[in-house]
Amino acid sequence: MSNATLLTAFILTGLPHAPGLDAPLFGIFLVVYVLTVLGNLLILLVIRVDSHLHTPMYYFLTNLSFIDMWFSTVTVPKMLMTLVSPSGRTISFHSCVAQLYFFHFLGSTECFLYTVMSYDRYLAISYPLRYTNMMTGRSCALLATGTWLSGSLHSAVQTILTFHLPYCGPNQIQHYFCDAPPILKLACADTSANEMVIFVNIGLVASGCFVLIVLSYVSIVCSILRIRTSEGRHRAFQTCASHCIVVLCFFGPGLFIYLRPGSRDALHGVVAVFYTTLTPLFNPVVYTLRNKEVKKALLKLKNGSVFAQGE
């Protein structure tokens, strides 16, 4: 970090909202956060205890649920504190650094993971006979490890570049958590180079992953159309549709914010709610809980037959 940094704390302005809505918003986001954590924990438990779900697709889903649980935890609790009292808006300099790092670490890891998951679906649908030999346990572990390491490297670069600048003036961040674009507006130095790096760094990562996902699904659709049975086509389309919904909910708001560095602060905050708060809640519902195999596993878990099966 730069030796010229003089600030010891920042003030978060919080989520843009009309006066008098603090209590209702606190209640809404508290419920959303609790449901997000419980929903993703339930998915982790079900996949862990049901041997029928020990497949590559659900292996990657456990990674996704784990990420979503913590991705929401990085930002939502602090947002709730800003709604409770003015003192909750203060965040120390080092806490801000940590929040920025883990936000981009988990966010970029999820971005890479979506790409890996689309590749997994491509192999499963396009090469069903060779799929088990191609997507082995070792291959899954290597792909998952690669996403975590890539996310860590990406976030480290982003965090170092952001806090290498001196911060000695205003300390009010126009956002409900520490993110690079609003933080850079407080720097006591020229930030044009940093903004360009953010645009290229995040833009290339997110756009690159999104393009690879689109290409994967174009190939998947072509393979699905060659499936002879209508039941097989319907099942393949259903699986892919769930993934596409989640991908659009995650990438759409993210690309909108980081590829528009001059966007308004209020708009930035509102759009950020979608991928920091709502997407982690949607994932267990859209991507997993609507799945027939998971529903069966949940029923077995409720009746206790899953644990009896493992004995």
Curated annotation (Swiss-Prot):
One of its GO terms (biological process) is detection of chemical stimulus involved in sensory perception of smell. The keyword Transmembrane applies. Glycans are attached at N3. The gene is OR10G7. Gene3D superfamilies: Rhodopsin 7-helix transmembrane proteins (1.20.1070.10). GO terms for molecular function: G protein-coupled receptor activity; olfactory receptor activity. The keyword Nucleus does not apply. Coiled coil: none annotated. Keywords: Cell membrane, Disulfide bond, G-protein coupled receptor, Glycoprotein, Membrane, Olfaction, Receptor, Sensory transduction, Transducer, Transmembrane, Transmembrane helix. This is Olfactory receptor 10G7. The chain crosses the membrane at residues 24-44, 53-73, 99-119, 139-159, 197-216, 237-257, 269-289. Residues 45-52, 120-138, 217-236, 290-311 are cytoplasmic. Residues 1-23, 74-98, 160-196, 258-268 are extracellular. Its main location: membrane. It is found in: Cell membrane. It comes from Homo sapiens (Human). SUPFAM superfamilies: Family A G protein-coupled receptor-like (SSF81321). GO terms for cellular component: plasma membrane. Belongs to the G-protein coupled receptor 1 family.
